């Protein structure tokens, strides 16, 4: 007998499985697009290159680097990339929190406040030892001004002019502020001279160095914020506001601009409030350094001393007074 022409030359029941054949096909265009999108998002959050991610995924799936991905590999490949992306997103978020926190640590005594807080609350001494949730909590508390910030130690003020090192420090802060705001260095220095109250040709006194540095750093920090408020202004100050200062600045803001602590401030309002804080502190410092005329509260012998002085200027009266005193003493005895 001869086989029927056109019939497959294979045993009955051993025909090729269509599903098995499809799984051995290369990745479809849709599948490759899904994987490429995941890889694009992944490399945007990491320092890896596209080829490196493809190779790492194949290694995880047990596929040789030079072997092509097949359709049957797609579910495992998608899951692998999704997991990698989740880890990268979490790491990126943690880096952002740590970056914001590190920036705030350079403001005022925030570093000391954070160090005290994490030691008391978490029993740790370094930010690297905290969990992501703990880092977020510390950042939130610091941004909202809810950490107890110790007052910086005050150095005695002096009328001497700025030292070269102090002038260079201010100049560096001016340069940073100019880069952040687009304002010219010359205009910023002019504002500082006007704030300091020095006349043309005079030098800024060293006693205003700390206040000017605080003013410059606060302006730079707030210029990077899209919605500054009184709360963020307070947090931006290197030398934090004392309770009476905070009350005064709130009253000034309410009276001048009718704004509340949560109101978003304009650039002009931010600068005016910082100027107001600067002038208040300089004025308060001047009052504290003003010499006081100290006199005794009670001088019981003052009248007697004045009387003796008057009598000593007139010997005759002094002699008569002495006789009267002796006579009275004789009568009493």
Curated annotation (Swiss-Prot):
Transmembrane domains' residue ranges: 312-332
Entry's Gene Ontology BP terms: regulation of gene expression
GO cellular component labels: plasma membrane
UniProt topology in membrane: Single-pass membrane protein
Source superkingdom: Bacteria
Topology Periplasmic: residue spans: 333
Cytoplasmic compartment segments: 1-311
Region (Disordered) residue spans: 1-27
Position of the signal peptide: none
Protein family: Belongs to the flk family.
This protein's name: Flagellar regulator flk
């Amino acid at each position: 007998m001869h086989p029927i022409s056109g019939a497959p030359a294979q045993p009955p029941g051993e025909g090729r499985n269509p599903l098995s054949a499809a799984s051995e096909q290369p990745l479809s265009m849709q599948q490759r697009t899904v994987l490429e999108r995941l890889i694009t998002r992944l490399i945007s959050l990491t320092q890896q290159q596209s080829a490196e991610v493809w190779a790492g995924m194949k290694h995880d799936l047990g596929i040789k680097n030079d072997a092509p991905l097949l359709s049957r590999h797609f579910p495992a490949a998608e899951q692998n990339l999704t997991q990698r992306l989740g880890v990268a997103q979490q790491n990126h978020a943690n880096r952002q929190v740590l970056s914001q926190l590190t920036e705030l640590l350079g403001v005022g005594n925030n570093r000391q406040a954070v160090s005290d807080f994490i030691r008391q609350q978490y029993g740790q001494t370094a930010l690297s030892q905290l969990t992501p949730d703990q880092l977020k909590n510390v950042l939130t508390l610091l941004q909202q001004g809810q950490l107890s910030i110790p007052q910086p130690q005050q150095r005695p003020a002096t009328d001497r002019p700025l030292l070269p090192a102090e002038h260079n420090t201010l100049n560096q802060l001016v340069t940073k502020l100019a880069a952040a705001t687009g304002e010219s260095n010359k205009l910023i220095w002019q504002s500082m001279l006007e704030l300091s109250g020095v006349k043309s040709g005079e030098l800024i006194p060293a006693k205003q160095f700390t206040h000017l540095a605080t003013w410059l750093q606060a302006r730079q920090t707030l210029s990077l914020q899209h919605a500054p408020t009184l709360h963020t202004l307070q947090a931006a100050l290197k030398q934090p506001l004392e309770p009476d200062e905070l009350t005064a600045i709130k009253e000034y803001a309410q009276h001048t601009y009718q704004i509340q602590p949560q109101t978003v401030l304009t650039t002009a309002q931010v600068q005016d409030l910082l100027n107001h804080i600067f002038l208040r502190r300089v004025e308060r410092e001047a009052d504290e350094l003003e010499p006081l005329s100290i006199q005794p509260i009670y001088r019981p012998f003052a009248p007697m001393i004045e009387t003796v002085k008057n009598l000593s200027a007139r010997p005759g009266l002094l002699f008569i007074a002495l006789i009267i005193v002796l006579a009275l003493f004789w009568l009493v005895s």
